[in-house]
């Protein structure tokens, strides 16, 4: 069954897409709909707010990361059990990854994704400082690309009743229906930092209150019936299936611990789904305050903002030691960006896990963009020469030890011949954010390594002298016992890693 969608776009960043999209998700849910939320592009932060509003995981649709052919199946997978989808766009409507020649349509734009799905676009226009000019703006966006259908406009930050009247007249002149008019209000402002909004998990209770405020404002000022009436989709793809994606894998029991909590909030829902499909039990733990779950066979350290919590991460020396010992035993450890920073010897002078020899520091230099990466060496995840498109998103720098083995070399239009990350034994750590659906073999390979390289390493260490064994006591225990588990985190991040059973945020 096809599930209709609307894509919420804007002429430019800063127009209020996230506010309107999140409020629309919440208002539709409040009206009795089951809403599937999506974000165009690789962004991890906005889906956290979407998840709070929808009560189910926020997901990403990025044809640059996963390719055009997977957008329809990932959409079909994400809308399962829903009756409508809201897709928040990225940047301006036609903005995306610009090709080396320029001039061609940008890949991964909101218009690109909307066209792939046959979804109509609702344009959010920041009305501050303009009135009749809105007609020219809407005319241009409506006629620029025949593959993009603008079904209506939501006017944001409207100054007064008179201002709204003039704006509506301008929209009529352009032939674009007005679906809502949002007044200027400070209650919808969300805190930001250098990489966008403060994450919903970090913002905590205030994030939930902000989502409630967005929901109330959209419910009051947007014609939901008109939004539903204009929704549509031409996508008729079979849903992406993680079981089919990972293929045949080892089925012996294995526990994969995924870092969560305030410091590790960047992750795609499909990652945990693929690990489960490969036969793993996925358990969250918070490195700020918890230890590894008993029986942990492998660790995933996703992205986030560890530089905001360096002292707290360093203070939990028990879990740092456990991760170090697990890695020393040959267990698979997959770390992206924040995970890499957590694995090095120190971050801004604070001791970290010491798994990767090197030090990291916060800088003022933003590294942001897609990367065409080539695997430099065989690892628990990739084969040498394997090509992956990923995303870099940080303001830190790592100085590796001279003897390190890099994970990737970046090639292509944005950066060329730049080496990133480190690989040794079962550890694969780098700045590169990847989408698991684009490289499903990795999930199975990572899972299989739990039962091969790890068990072999622990057996060898058991035979070693006590001075060596003392450093891997937890790792050996992890193989022998798989009974008790630490409590699952009670946080909105559970929605982001798709823990068993969709549930509303607490």
Over which residues does each language-model region extend?
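ATP-dependent carboxylate-amine ligase catalytic core
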Residues: 2-19, 25-117, 125-152, 161-165
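Internal gly/pro-rich beta-alpha loop/helix module
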Residues: 131-248
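C-terminal and late-domain segments of enzyme folds
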Residues: 250-252, 265-274, 281, 368-372, ...
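Cysteine-nucleophile active-site neighborhood
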Residues: 306-381
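N-terminal amphipathic/hydrophobic targeting modules at extreme N-termini
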Residues: 458-462, 466-477, 491-493
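Intrinsically disordered, low-complexity proline-rich tandem-repeat tracts
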Residues: 460, 487, 492, 498, ...
């Amino acid at each position: 069954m096809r599930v209709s969608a609307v894509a919420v776009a804007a002429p430019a960043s800063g127009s209020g897409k996230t506010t309107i999209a999140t409020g629309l998700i919440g208002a539709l849910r409040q009206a009795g709909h089951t809403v599937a939320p999506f974000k165009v592009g690789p962004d991890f932060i906005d889906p956290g707010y979407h998840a709070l509003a929808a009560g189910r995981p926020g997901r990403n649709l990025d044809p640059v990361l996963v390719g055009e052919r997977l957008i329809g199946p990932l959409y079909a997978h994400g809308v399962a059990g829903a009756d409508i989808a809201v897709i928040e766009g990225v940047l301006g409507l036609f903005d995306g990854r610009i090709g080396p020649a320029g001039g061609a349509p940008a890949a991964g734009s909101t218009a690109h994704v909307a066209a792939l799905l046959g979804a109509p676009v609702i344009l959010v226009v920041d009305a501050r400082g303009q009135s009749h000019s809105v007609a020219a703006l809407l005319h241009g966006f409506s006629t620029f690309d025949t593959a993009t259908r603008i079904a209506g406009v939501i006017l944001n930050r409207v100054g007064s009743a008179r201002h709204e009247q003039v704006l509506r007249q301008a929209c009529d002149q352009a032939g674009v229906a007005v679906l809502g008019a949002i007044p200027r209000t400070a209650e919808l402002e969300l805190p930001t930092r250098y990489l966008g909004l403060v994450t919903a998990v970090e913002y905590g209770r205030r994030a939930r209150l902000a989502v409630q405020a967005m929901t109330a404002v959209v419910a009051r000022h947007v014609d939901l019936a008109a939004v539903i009436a204009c929704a549509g989709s031409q996508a008729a793809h079979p849903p992406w299936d993680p079981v089919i994606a990972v293929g045949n894998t080892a089925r012996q029991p294995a526990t994969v611990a995924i870092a969560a909590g305030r410091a590790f909030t960047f992750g795609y829902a499909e990652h945990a789904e693929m690990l489960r499909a490969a036969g793993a039990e996925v358990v969250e733990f918070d490195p700020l305050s918890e230890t590894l779950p008993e029986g942990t066979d492998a660790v995933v350290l996703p992205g986030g903002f560890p530089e905001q919590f360096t002292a707290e991460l360093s203070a939990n020396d028990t879990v740092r030691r456990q991760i170090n010992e697990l890695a020393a035993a040959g267990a698979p450890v997959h770390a992206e960006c924040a995970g890499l920073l957590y694995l090095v010897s120190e971050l801004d002078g604070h001791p970290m896990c010491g798994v990767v020899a090197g030090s990291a520091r916060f800088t003022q230099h933003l590294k942001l963009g897609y990367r065409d990466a080539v695997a430099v060496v065989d690892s628990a995840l990739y084969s040498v020469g394997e090509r992956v498109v990923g995303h870099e998103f940080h303001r830190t720098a790592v100085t590796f030890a001279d003897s390190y083995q890099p994970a990737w070399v970046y090639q292509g239009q944005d950066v060329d011949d730049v080496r990133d990350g480190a690989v040794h034994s079962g550890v694969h750590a780098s700045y590169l954010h990847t989408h698991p659906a684009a490289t499903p073999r990795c999930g199975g390979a990572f899972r299989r390594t739990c039962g091969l390289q790890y068990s072999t390493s622990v057996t060898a260490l058991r035979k070693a002298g006590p001075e060596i064994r003392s450093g891997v006591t937890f790792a050996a225990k992890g193989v022998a016992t798989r009974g008790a588990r630490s409590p699952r985190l009670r946080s909105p991040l559970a929605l982001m890693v798709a823990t068993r059973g969709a549930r509303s945020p607490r």
